[in-house]
Amino acid sequence: MSLINLLPQKIEEELRSNSLLKVISGLNNFDAQSVKTIVEAAALGGADLVDIACKPELVDIALKHSELHVCVSSVVPHSFLDSVKAGASLIEIGNYDTFYEKGINFSDEKVLNITKETRDLLPNVPLSVTVPHTMPIDKQVDLALNLVDESVDIIQTEGGTSSSPYSSGIQGFFEKSVPTLAATYAISQEFKKQSVEIPIMSASGLSQVTCPLAISCGASAVGVGSAVNKLDDLISM
């Protein structure tokens, strides 16, 4: 049974209208000032949701300095507990980039085990799970379907770290977005075939140029990270 209806009304409405924008500060970004700046920029820029590292102090900062709803990301199920108590509206297993950089990948079995443990700990909290881009597309689709069976509420795709654009400018934006767009499209098509109504969030490698393509590929939401959080000041963000 989906817990989408337990999300704040605005988030639920944006998901259903395929127009949710999430800004990602990074799973490993525990710098309070950095998170504060990203949250303020996200609020000023019209985002609906901010995705931050799973630490209750950061949840407090996000809620204090904006009216945005908060998603927290981790791969350690027990770490979600205190952040949910602090006011996080959504929990997410994902943002694997820092692990990829260390040569650590996530198998379908590992993702499913983390998901099951998280769901057992927090059965009444909306849960999003990222499908690792390191898997072949057909395996990503299979994992997405298995995650639906585990009562996951949102499926997130990724791919930016696996794509190094050959070109600069606008063409580079398109090249970088290909992995996450391909995964989004493939999962969306299979969901349609099987009448699965779980929303898909397309994230990683997206920019203002390619976010509309994600929606065209079947996403209900988009997540942007480095396009925002690697900038140096509030106005640029």
Residue ranges with predicted function:
Residues 2-202, 207-237:
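Alpha/beta enzyme core
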